[in-house]
Structure formats: structure tokens, C-alpha cells
Amino acid sequence: MKLCVALDMASKEANLALAHELSGLDVWLKVGLRAYLRDGAKFIEELKGVTDFRVFLDLKLYDIPNTMADAAEVIAKVGVDMINLHASSGTHAMRTVMSRLNALPSRPLVLAVSALTSFDESEFSAVYNENLAAAVRKFSVMSYEAGLDGMVCSVFESRLIKDTTSTDFLTLTPGVRPFGESADDQKRVADLSAAKEQGSDFIVVGRPIYESNEPREICERILGKI
């Protein structure tokens, strides 16, 4: 299991300072929509310049197939190591993206978002008119058959996805509160032991690290447990 640290702070300077503080640790860095819109591809270059960090660019692509493929190709050429898109964009869109990326000399890992961890069962049903677990199964099969590398899901769906597809199909799980911290705006959260039990390949941790006075120490504690 790998730790992915969310760089969700309010300024590029704060995010870069955290990256420098974590230099040398075996962690991934997650760059979200706000940071990328504000700081652009140059920010990715700066992160890569700190040390040999691998970067997950969390933009959750969702559009018509060719537009998604165009965007994915541009993102891949920025040099990130993982990207994501919405499974609900459909099988054709996901296959179009993978066909485009597989034609490149190298490509990032591509994960599909099943259901945002800010959704609970009732909110998900109101949007998709479907049971959460059933939808996750459907989305995981669609993504697996489209040739993606894995899924973004809650800890509680990780084992379900692997049982439905393959143990090699990656799961990245946001909403992890390693030591029982507040859930904030997440609904389906879990701790480290649950993430390990459910077979998560990547865990995303943000606030418990960057809101700490000792973020490197928190990362080291997490790494020691995974």
C-alpha cells in the first residue's frame, strides 16, 4: 500500500513547502483541481524538481470521448504518473482515452472514479437512481474491460471492486483518516486498519498531514503502519 499526500493547501508556496518537507519519503503527491488551475503544468515541474516524487493529477475528467482523450493526452505529456476520469463518462469514452494514451511512448496510470466519497447512499441514489454497491460493481467492470488500471473509490468498496474484477486492478482510496481524525466534508471515511483489510493499493491523506505541526512525522507514522 502506498501513501498519496494531498496538496490541497491555499497557495502554491505552502504546497511546495510541504513537498520539500517530505523530500526523501516514499510517498506520492496528489495535485487537485484548484492547485492545477491556479499553478498549472509549471507546478508539476517544480514538484518533480524537489525530489523523485510521483504525482497523481486529480482532475476527474468528464466530457465527450474525443475531448476527454485530447485532455488526457495533454496531461500525460506534462509528465504526471497517474490521472483519473469519471467511470460514468461511459465505456466508449474510457476506451477512447486508453487508445490515445497507449499510442504514446509512455503513459500514466489511469483510474476511474466510481462514486465521490462525499456521497452517502441517499445522495448517490438521488443522482444516479441506483444502489451504490451495484453501481460500483457496474463501473468497475466497465473500467476494467476498457483497459484502465484501477478505480478511485472509498475504502469500503475496494475489496468489492477487486472481487468483481481482479486483485491486480488497483484501488486508490480517498477519505482516509489514519488516526481517527474528523471526517470533515467526506461521508465514507475509514482508518488505516480498514484500508489494509479492504486491500487498498493507494490511500490519500490530506488534512491530517498538512494541518499538522509535524507533517513529516505524521507521514513517517503512516508509512510505519502500512
UniProtKB/Swiss-Prot annotation:
Q: Which InterPro entries match?
A: Aldolase_TIM, OMPdecase, OMPdecase_AS, OMPdecase_bac, OMPdeCOase_dom, RibuloseP-bd_barrel
Q: Which SUPFAM superfamilies match?
A: Ribulose-phoshate binding barrel (SSF51366)
* Broad enzyme group: lyase
The reaction(s) catalysed by this protein are: orotidine 5'-phosphate + H(+) = UMP + CO2
Q: What is its EC number?
A: 4.1.1.23
Q: Give the CC-aspect GO terms.
A: cytosol
Where substrate binds, per the record, is at 8, 30, 58-67, 117, 177, 186, 206-207
Q: Which family does it belong to?
A: Belongs to the OMP decarboxylase family. Type 1 subfamily.
Show the NCBIfam families listed in the entry. Answer: PRK00230.1, pyrF
Give the protein name, as stated in the record: Orotidine 5'-phosphate decarboxylase
Q: Which organism is it from?
A: Campylobacter curvus (strain 525.92)
**Gene name of this polypeptide:** pyrF
